[in-house]
A protein has these predicted regions:
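Strongly charged
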Residues: 5, 17-21, 27-87
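Extended boundary segments
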Residues: 1-11
Length: 87
């Protein structure tokens, strides 16, 4: 599954176009490598996503094409959530 599609389906990012913009800015890392929106991801991959001053590290638990809002958080596990100080 494409990275941008997963981020939208899992509701980590609201829109697929926004996920693409964030990836193009280099704010998403998959298994230690900067990722593009079209990067293929798999179950067990580790994602680091920077939202402003928050760095979220998650592990992918499942991949589904569509999911109900209540079940979206079952697609991933949050491993770490940290805040980055502004310089």
């Amino acid at each position: 599954m494409r990275l941008d599609k997963f981020l939208k389906v899992s509701r980590l990012i609201k829109r697929r176009t926004l996920a693409k913009e964030i990836a193009d800015q280099g704010r998403i890392i998959v298994n230690g490598n900067k990722a593009k929106a079209a990067t293929n991801i798999a179950v067990g991959d580790e994602l680091k996503i920077q939202f402003g001053q928050k760095l979220l590290t998650i592990e992918i638990d499942a991949l589904k094409e569509t999911v109900k809002k209540d079940e979206a958080s079952e697609l991933y596990t949050i491993k770490q959530e940290e805040y980055i100080k502004a310089e």
